[in-house]
């Protein structure tokens, strides 16, 4: 009769300092299908090491171990996991049930790693628990079960994938006599159903219930009677659950890992929340800085555009502050006319300015008076609250009219509903108010400077007595490149003057500089926020490393029932990613709350969340989980199942 399990000259030794300590010495043993065998020996005799080798949890240092004719030494770790999953079932002295799972969920674990469909494995788990007398304890956690009930759950788990070979390590060691007798009766029933049952014990009363007793002492077998051939009942062989295809197994294990991750988070709510806190703050910082920074950037650019978009200012001299008398009269009215004829010009306005006293009744204020054309307000995109600008006839006739800004109107006419038509004194010259320019809001606040505008002809001839212009402002048509327009403008005036006695100031360059500056500042703040995200990620890695240490025994249990190293890696990696994703979602919610509060206090800001910002937050959370979860997950996957099971 061919042996199901066969060991030939198997030895197992472990390093101890510079020496090797032999635990098993030249063990040769055959166990046939359907046998009930007891391996007995005192503590330290090597019986547990022998059981670990029989269950493919450990490998011999030398010798050969075959399972159904297959040499175990030729199998890779995944093949060994499959062998444990499909052929072996473990029953431990301390039950080794996962405390955060129900009885049924504990029983299902081997089927999860076999890729069995959820409904099928749930039905089989309930069937096994019913057979073992636990139909009313299916949804109970281990803490609500007695020792005997927990051991029966452990037996059901061993049978989940068929359990052709049942390895029981001191199965009654932690039970009272009555529960112990019940467990032994179940093991005898399994033997009668065709299972091969191997019991490791030091209790001679337990060993006596086996068909064959193998005694081990100091790593050597000292008593090994021959196997007895015994006729079994027909039709009671161990039921084997067919495993699912690879893709289904992966999907099932992924869902289970996701479920386990969620249960692990729920089991330690406070620790999970504190772990997430770093991610929450990091993601909230990144998203808030991106969103609020973009709103601030748009506000800054809007303020710059309010000063005149697509505009080019022309000033006499070489640069600002140049008071050389030969350049003072460089710009003439004819230059303005020539500029207005250019096809790329939308509008152009001259400018002369002077400080004046403006009086109305007993109110006397100082203002900055600007002599401009009617196109000035179009050039700077200004609208009117009352009245309108001056027309070409008023400019030609040097009309004594004035446009006030909102601040000047409040100072001169605090109690008047309509001021158009009112007469004020500009210096000693009476002028009629024909319009009030609309106040333009700004993130920097509204200017307290008082401004008034008169026709440039009135300002030049009647007030200042000069024929030249202080500056010309040109608005370029939409779609025309402002840099090229500036070059053509420079060429035109240089040809007219015969020399370059002026300089230009392109507002687009200011806009571009502001965009670059705000982008740099936003990038810097984002990097600061990313640092907080990295700190949060390190916190996740630290807690996950602690979690791996705390759950070492759980990892050993999962490996014993058939989990591959990749399954363990996947589970802990998913846990880290899930912590970061939930933290990221809470971080986005926090950033939305921050944005909402800012919107209340800064109603002029347009704060909005783009898909790019939200997608970036999601990717950041996922990447953080993968990056900082990899090391703990790898450490978990590299654990030796024997060492993991031995830890408390």
UniProtKB/Swiss-Prot annotation:
Main enzyme class = translocase
Give me the segments passing through the membrane: 273-293, 417-437, 523-543, 577-597, 611-631
Q: Which UniProt keywords apply?
A: Antibiotic resistance, ATP-binding, Cell inner membrane, Cell membrane, Membrane, Nucleotide-binding, Translocase, Transmembrane, Transmembrane helix, Transport
Answer whether the UniProt record assigns the keyword Cell membrane to this protein.
yes
User: Gene3D superfamilies, from UniProt?
Assistant: P-loop containing nucleotide triphosphate hydrolases
Membrane topology, record value:
Multi-pass membrane protein
Ranges where the ABC transporter domain occurs: 5-243
GO molecular function terms noted in the UniProt entry: ATP binding; ATP hydrolysis activity; transmembrane transporter activity
Q: Name one GO cellular component term.
A: plasma membrane
Residue sites binding ATP per the record: 41-48
Which GO biological process entries does UniProt record here?
A: response to antibiotic
Magnesium in keyword set? no
Give EC number(s), comma-separated.
7.6.2.-
Q: Where in the cell is it found?
A: Cell inner membrane
What subunit structure does UniProt give? Homodimer. Part of the tripartite efflux system MacAB-TolC, which is composed of an inner membrane transporter, MacB, a periplasmic membrane fusion protein, MacA, and an outer membrane component, TolC. The complex forms a large protein conduit and can translocate molecules across both the inner and outer membranes. Interacts with MacA.
Question: Could you tell me what this protein does?
Answer: Part of the tripartite efflux system MacAB-TolC. MacB is a non-canonical ABC transporter that contains transmembrane domains (TMD), which form a pore in the inner membrane, and an ATP-binding domain (NBD), which is responsible for energy generation. Confers resistance against macrolides.
Give the family per the record. Belongs to the ABC transporter superfamily. Macrolide exporter (TC 3.A.1.122) family.
Protein name, please?
Macrolide export ATP-binding/permease protein MacB
